[in-house]
């Protein structure tokens, strides 16, 4: 009976999160699920404490990074960067396509996939419309912004909430994670550029007139804060690198930097700090705790052991098969039931599997790659994608779920394969 309850509660929670009836917040949906598993006795008080211990650092780090990115957006930092990329293309369509993806990859690395997709996309959309592109020409650039935000959100622990949760679960330190995922991220970037170019090659204009694009300096709304932002970024990077050596949770460092930046931004006329703070994804904290408790319910009734047995079987076929198998399992599960519950279920199953340590390491990182890229197959793969599609509708661009799936599955599978190949080469060479 307990097993049935755990499964039913999981699917009820998942349905509420994806469907969001009457705008029901994802945090509330996850808490409803959490309360149900607590009331029914599927999880206990010890589980609650364990879950909070796992997710608090991850979620607070994520919120801090998004806060910093929102202030940077307010002062025109990302628009300034995007204009530079367009100007650098010198009127060459393919160059602009590639440069925008490189910019998206950089933003995703340092400010998470959500920041890259939700901040960069409206900026790029406004610029290419200003260039006089019709809807057929707009589509490749919009898809590229959304895709690259996830496909290159691998290199740093903070680049994706999925990364943070998995790294915290397995106790992976910042530098250790970077050393393993830097090369796979490069493979993903190169594969993304090649696959997206091949798919959209007939829709990318050969040339365009850049005379209508304003100068980069015109995008800067607060020169003082713009200059300070470079110091903030330097401190952020240093903080990432030294956090594990000084044994301070990375959320303390990112949180402190975010608070300092907010206090400095309060003196600016262009940054509305109250709106920035309100716009941060605080519901992610509640969502993560609630969703994790629901997943722990599945673990407690032995459901994750089924997946663990499957992974143990895959592990017997060697490192390459283990990485590919885990990566594609994670990707398709993410596409079907969202990447957050997927990465949690997979992480627990990997931990419970009988794979040897070297194989298990490959599976841990392959799970992250699959959960980062898998959401590009379907709109429900990640909460960020659903929000991204909603933002596009508000901007007058409607992408149907059918169009998204038809495009997403063709683009994602080859990129996923080459990214996992990059991980395999990293682990056998280094």
Curated annotation (Swiss-Prot):
One of its GO terms (molecular function) is arsenite transmembrane transporter activity. GO terms for cellular component: plasma membrane. One of its GO terms (biological process) is response to arsenic-containing substance. This is Arsenical pump membrane protein. The chain crosses the membrane at residues 4-24, 26-46, 51-71, 100-120, 138-158, 181-201, 223-243, 245-265, 276-296, 317-337, 373-393, 409-429. It is a multi-pass membrane protein. Belongs to the ArsB family. Involved in arsenical resistance. Thought to form the channel of an arsenite pump. Pfam families: ArsB (PF02040). Keywords: Arsenical resistance, Cell membrane, Membrane, Transmembrane, Transmembrane helix, Transport. Signal peptide: none annotated. The lineage of its organism: Bacteria, Bacillati, Bacillota, Bacilli, Bacillales. It is found in: Cell membrane. It comes from the Bacteria. NCBIfam families: 2a45 (TIGR00935), arsB_Sta_pI258 (NF033877), PRK15445.1 (NF011980). Its main location: membrane. The keyword Protease does not apply.
